[in-house]
């Protein structure tokens, strides 16, 4: 991932102004994108992702959509890693009262991903959560036909419907169940202001459901969703839930989404975290984070 040609933009960040890299008007038409909120340790995941993309010689930049509460120092580090930092405003679903409808309360912040459809200087973007690492070049995904929303089928053992015994029903308020249910941690989409406005309008009249923006995006794009192979988003839980579907030698993208599997927090003490394959994948992440030198 070559250092981007950029123009400077001043971002107001409390008492300090931060000069960040911004999209060059003649820049690339595709990009990778991730999302960061708050002042916690997820910035390490974004740094790791940026280094991973550079190591596999990705041809396109990594855009980091940040909420206003991401501190200036974190933004500065990301710029130093070659990221294009873009501040976005929060997005909130309709109020649901005191009780959270989400499987995990923090899922509510993930609705901010809808802002990514505003990034219309790009024709296509591949979104990846900050707890993802890329171990092989995936630029070729940008060559897939336009007009579709691409994602990897999620493991539904703890979600809805097939292929495992049903544990939670697909929310009736979201209409017909999609033909496949993709994971919201990695997907390819086409930024578009009309789509963006439709997303926000639909969100305003759609009650929140357990898996937050993942449910919502599955509902919204149900008619144009296309599956891509699981090698592009290996959920680490698949290693013990569906080992028959996993060939680690072919996996290009790993999603450290299970509790205890985040490499920068890893202790090996949580359930399933003492597995040899998990330890190997955590070590691979750290090899990139610690050893890869920027812009070489």
Language model features: what each stretch is:
Residues 1-296:
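Glycosyltransferase catalytic domains, chiefly GT-A lineage
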């Amino acid at each position: 991932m070559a250092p981007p040609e950029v123009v400077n933009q001043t971002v107001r960040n409390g008492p300090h102004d931060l000069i960040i890299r911004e999209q060059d008007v003649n820049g690339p038409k595709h990009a990778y994108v991730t999302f960061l909120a708050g002042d916690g340790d997820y910035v390490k995941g974004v740094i790791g992702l940026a280094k991973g993309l550079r190591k596999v010689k990705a041809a396109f930049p990594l855009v980091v959509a940040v909420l206003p509460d991401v501190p200036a120092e974190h933004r500065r580090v990301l710029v130093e890693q070659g990221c294009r930092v873009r501040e976005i405003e929060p997005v909130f679903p309709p109020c649901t009262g005191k009780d959270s409808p989400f499987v995990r309360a923090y899922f509510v912040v993930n609705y901010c991903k809808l802002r990514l459809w505003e990034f219309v200087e790009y024709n296509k973007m591949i979104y990846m959560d900050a707890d993802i690492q890329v171990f092989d070049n995936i630029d070729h995904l940008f060559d897939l036909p336009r007009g579709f929303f691409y994602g990897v089928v999620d493991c539904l053992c703890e979600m809805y419907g097939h292929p495992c015994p049903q544990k939670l029903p697909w929310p009736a308020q979201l209409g017909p169940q999609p033909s496949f249910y993709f994971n919201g941690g990695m997907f390819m989409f086409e930024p578009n202001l009309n789509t963006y406005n439709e997303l926000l309008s639909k969100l305003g009249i759609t009650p929140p459901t357990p898996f937050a923006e993942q449910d919502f995006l599955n509902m919204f794009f149900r008619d144009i969703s296309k599956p891509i192979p699981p090698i592009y988003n290996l959920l680490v839980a698949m290693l013990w839930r569906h080992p028959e579907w996993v060939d680690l030698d072919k996996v290009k993208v790993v999603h450290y989404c299970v509790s205890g599997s985040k490499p920068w927090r890893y202790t090996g003490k949580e359930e399933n975290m003492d597995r040899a394959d998990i330890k190997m994948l955590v070590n691979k992440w750290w090899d990139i984070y610690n050893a890869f030198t920027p812009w070489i």
